[in-house]
Amino acid sequence: MTNIRKSHPLLKIVNNAFIDLPAPSNISSWWNFGSLLGICLIMQIMTGLFLAMHYTSDTTTAFSSVAHICRDVNYGWIIRYLHANGASMFFICLYIHVGRGLYYGSYAFLETWNIGIILLFTVMATAFMGYVLPWGQMSFWGATVITNLLSAIPYVGTTLVEWIWGGFSVDKATLTRFFAFHFILPFIIAALAGVHLLFLHETGSNNPTGISSDMDKIPFHPYYTIKDILGALLLILILLLLVLFSPDLLGDPDNYTPANPLNTPPHIKPEWYFLFAYAILRSIPNKLGGVLALILSILILAFIPLLHTSKQRSMMFRPISQCLFWTLVADLLTLTWIGGQPVEPPFIMIGQVASILSFSLILILMPVAGIIENHILKW
């Protein structure tokens, strides 16, 4: 008799994805972040659901309802901070996951990569709308500034912004719709993640060498299930350290002031995980140019498979490309720092140089390095 996990219509899917899945024997800890993202998503949906039970999406009561959650609801404070800091962990895992894909050439799986890019955009949209919900100063002004960017679109821009706002400014209608979208999008993300996994399992996982591992596969369970559990425990440990010891470390103090349309905060900035894109936006003096650069800073990932010139898939044996990759990482960290600084010298110039460098690295230097490395192989 066949094992139920191999014959049952539902269990068969789980079995083929998480138990009997043939996996490369040499995938490193950089491959842990996919499962960690799944854990982050489940955690965000669960904590978010409990927060939604007590939250009110009305401009007059939103801020008070968040205070009420933290003060009066049983364990409301920990649920709120798990959700807020869980978003930070989510983005750390996301950026590492994308970085891993870049380094080891996982972008050669085109469908998986492109759905990943759609996922990244969707998660960013969800996080942005979630930041608006507590209705603090930075929530309100962040929503105003970022939605206003759409007014840079010629001809239809202003109409589009007012349509998104549901009025002539960010107000009750905006908050209500943002809450609705923030609630529904994680489920769309979960569905997309399922498709992401479906396409990945069509080809099988990549591995650090970038060479086919078909001749050396091991079952996912127990080898990688135990490895993923260890990763999950470390993730939860870091998250709990953050939540229990320094819950406001990554937040903005301005968001503890209720939203006031008549008082603009001195420095409007998004959450830390958007600062690199915000720095690129600010480093271009033209509004439409800035918006295009902002979108392109993420959308450039879609062009990476087209820009791959090397005969090798992975960067494991390509020292020049490795050097450029880590320069890109350092550059994005520099942009993250600049995004949190006021718009004044020397930060303006640093931001502009770092922005130009980030695009140059991806569009020019890395493809050229690939060609050079191909020639070095012939020597």
Curated annotation (Swiss-Prot):
Pfam families: Cytochrom_B_C (PF00032), Cytochrome_B (PF00033). GO terms for cellular component: mitochondrial inner membrane; respiratory chain complex III. It comes from the Eukaryota. Its cofactor is heme b. Its main location: mitochondrion. InterPro entries: Cyt_b/b6_C (IPR005798), Cyt_b/b6_C_sf (IPR036150), Cyt_b/b6_N (IPR005797), Cytb/b6-like_sf (IPR027387), Cytochrome_b (IPR030689), Cytochrome_b_C_euk/bac (IPR048260), Cytochrome_b_N_euk/bac (IPR048259), Di-haem_cyt_TM (IPR016174). Binds 2 heme b groups non-covalently. Heme b b566 binds at residues 97, 196. A ubiquinone binds at residue 201. It is found in: Mitochondrion inner membrane. GO terms for biological process: mitochondrial electron transport, ubiquinol to cytochrome c. Heme b b562 binds at residues 83, 182. The chain crosses the membrane at residues 33-53, 77-98, 113-133, 178-198, 226-246, 288-308, 320-340, 347-367. Keywords: Electron transport, Heme, Iron, Membrane, Metal-binding, Mitochondrion, Mitochondrion inner membrane, Respiratory chain, Transmembrane, Transmembrane helix, Transport, Ubiquinone. It is a multi-pass membrane protein. Heme 1 (or BL or b562) is low-potential and absorbs at about 562 nm, and heme 2 (or BH or b566) is high-potential and absorbs at about 566 nm. The cytochrome bc1 complex contains 11 subunits: 3 respiratory subunits (MT-CYB, CYC1 and UQCRFS1), 2 core proteins (UQCRC1 and UQCRC2) and 6 low-molecular weight proteins (UQCRH/QCR6, UQCRB/QCR7, UQCRQ/QCR8, UQCR10/QCR9, UQCR11/QCR10 and a cleavage product of UQCRFS1). This cytochrome bc1 complex then forms a dimer. Component of the ubiquinol-cytochrome c reductase complex (complex III or cytochrome b-c1 complex) that is part of the mitochondrial respiratory chain. The b-c1 complex mediates electron transfer from ubiquinol to cytochrome c. Contributes to the generation of a proton gradient across the mitochondrial membrane that is then used for ATP synthesis. This is Cytochrome b. It comes from Vicugna pacos. The lineage of its organism: Eukaryota, Metazoa, Chordata, Craniata, Vertebrata.
